[in-house]
Amino acid sequence: MAVGKNKRLTKGGKKGAKKKIVDPFSKKDWYDVKAPAMFNIRNIGKTLVSRTQGTRIASDGLKGRVFEVSLADLQNDEVAFRKFKLISEDVQGKNCLTNFHGMDLTRDKMCSMVKKWQTMIEAHVDVKTTDGYLLRLFCVGFTKKRTNQIRKTSYAQHQQVRQIRKKMMEIMTREVQTNDLKEVVNKLIPDSVGKDIEKACQSIYPLHDVYVRKVKMLKKPKFELGKLMELHGEGGGSSAAKPSGDDTGAKVDRADGYEPPIQETV
């Protein structure tokens, strides 16, 4: 072994001695998460992010965050099996402005619907809204006994399943194709699409538990601040839904240099 100085000893002091413990939360800030105006409860919670430091800007860390919220919390309701995904698209002051990003049913609800002695029918379709959002909708329905039926099972024939699936796809395409994202979300909240499918398929085979079980966001148009502000009731138009109830969030401040979109008709 070569003779020389031991570098560890000459540095002095114990290894890792007196390391200053810094609380990580002292460098972070809380931001309010705001839901769009389609929902009754606007203030859905808070999120944490590191403060702006050098080139790392806090608002960039918040954009793109996805929040999963139960519809019961958004509507102050008891029906809690539907979950909505909201994505943070812009930051105004201490508020994160979110937009619709997807919908899902809870696992326990899906499991409770699947039973013996009935046929499960599923369908999915890719549809584009009038304002350029490409959505993938998944639908599920189950056959039920006819009135005065004695037989235990209620299985649909393969031809009937195909007819019902075709009807599901037609109704989902029609409901989304002719509306913008805001109107589509307004239909997903009470699940009027599922009720329409159930009514339309009665002549083929009686159904129950028909739901749009999942909505995926596949493609979005280019981000426009004006449209997002309209969703949050700041567009200046009367079309923005006004939230009701005492638990509604405060109005969001306008961005610096924000101008409302020019209206075609007055």
UniProtKB/Swiss-Prot annotation:
Keywords from the UniProt entry: Cytoplasm, Nucleus, Ribonucleoprotein, Ribosomal protein
Compartments where located: Cytoplasm; Nucleus; Nucleus, Nucleolus
Lineage, opening ranks: Eukaryota, Metazoa, Chordata, Craniata, Vertebrata
Signal peptide positions (record): none
Gene Ontology biological-process entries: ribosomal small subunit biogenesis; translation
Residue stretches of biased makeup (Basic and acidic residues): 244-257
Subunit structure: Component of the small ribosomal subunit. Mature ribosomes consist of a small (40S) and a large (60S) subunit. The 40S subunit contains about 33 different proteins and 1 molecule of RNA (18S). The 60S subunit contains about 49 different proteins and 3 molecules of RNA (28S, 5.8S and 5S). Part of the small subunit (SSU) processome, composed of more than 70 proteins and the RNA chaperone small nucleolar RNA (snoRNA) U3.
GO cellular component, one term: cytosolic small ribosomal subunit
Gene Ontology molecular function, alphabetical: structural constituent of ribosome
Region (Disordered) residue spans: 233-266
Top-level taxon: Eukaryota
PROSITE patterns xrefs: RIBOSOMAL_S3AE (PS01191)
Name of the protein in its database record: Small ribosomal subunit protein eS1
InterPro entries: Ribosomal_eS1 (IPR001593), Ribosomal_eS1_CS (IPR018281), Ribosomal_eS1_euk (IPR027500)
Gene it is expressed from: rps3a
HAMAP family: Ribosomal_eS1_euk (MF_03122)
Protein's job: Component of the small ribosomal subunit. The ribosome is a large ribonucleoprotein complex responsible for the synthesis of proteins in the cell. Part of the small subunit (SSU) processome, first precursor of the small eukaryotic ribosomal subunit. During the assembly of the SSU processome in the nucleolus, many ribosome biogenesis factors, an RNA chaperone and ribosomal proteins associate with the nascent pre-rRNA and work in concert to generate RNA folding, modifications, rearrangements and cleavage as well as targeted degradation of pre-ribosomal RNA by the RNA exosome.
Family according to the record: Belongs to the eukaryotic ribosomal protein eS1 family.
Predominant location category: cytoplasm
